[in-house]
Amino acid sequence: PNVRLSDEIIARRGAELAVVAEEAYQQLLKDNPDALHPVYIVGSEVPIPGGSQDAVETGLQVTKVSDFKQTVATFEKAFHDHQLDEAWKHVIGVVVQPGVEEKDAGCTPYDRSKAADLMASIKEYNNLVFEGHSTDYQTKISLRELVEDGVGILKVGPGLTYMMRE
């Protein structure tokens, strides 16, 4: 079915993966006591592989501030429920939709005015930045604006993957 999973299911699965990562890190420390602790990016707003097929025509919806905050709270609870309170301190980013998308026939450029409320909301979280997916077709100016506005992790994929494949 083409139905999005609930935030609770996504967060639970994320926490389950973090349990495995934390266990692997503890094993790594036995051989490498100076190993860096893993960091985590959480979220539920991940686009389909290859980008949206209709987003350019219909217009993208920027993540609502309330949805972003609910995502953070849901993941924090899932980490807590899996005894990962210490690991939660290593969550550094949250995946959001800042209004950019890539697709076969083009891309939706970043419009900071449409994302202003979302971008302002990250300032409430001192330890977090946004991760923006599908940013590799944005202009240099748009990339700079994304970073200035709070997208500290630019997720590339389709363009880079295509170039490597070719």
How would you label these PLM feature ranges?
Residues 1, 38-44, 92-96, 128-133, ...:
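Hydrophobic faces of well-ordered beta-strands that scaffold small-molecule active sites
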Residues 1, 139, 149-165:
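Glycine-rich phosphate-binding active-site loops on the catalytic face of alpha/beta enzymes
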Residues 1-50:
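Internal, well-ordered domain-core segments that constitute the primary functional module
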Residues 14, 41-81, 85-88, 92-100, ...:
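Active-site loop/helix belt of alpha/beta enzymes
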Residues 24-37, 81-91, 133:
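Flexible, glycine/charged-enriched surface loops at secondary-structure junctions
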Residues 47, 99-101, 137, 159-161:
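Short, glycine-/Ser/Thr-/acidic-enriched flexible segments
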Residues 146:
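Conserved, mostly hydrophobic/aromatic
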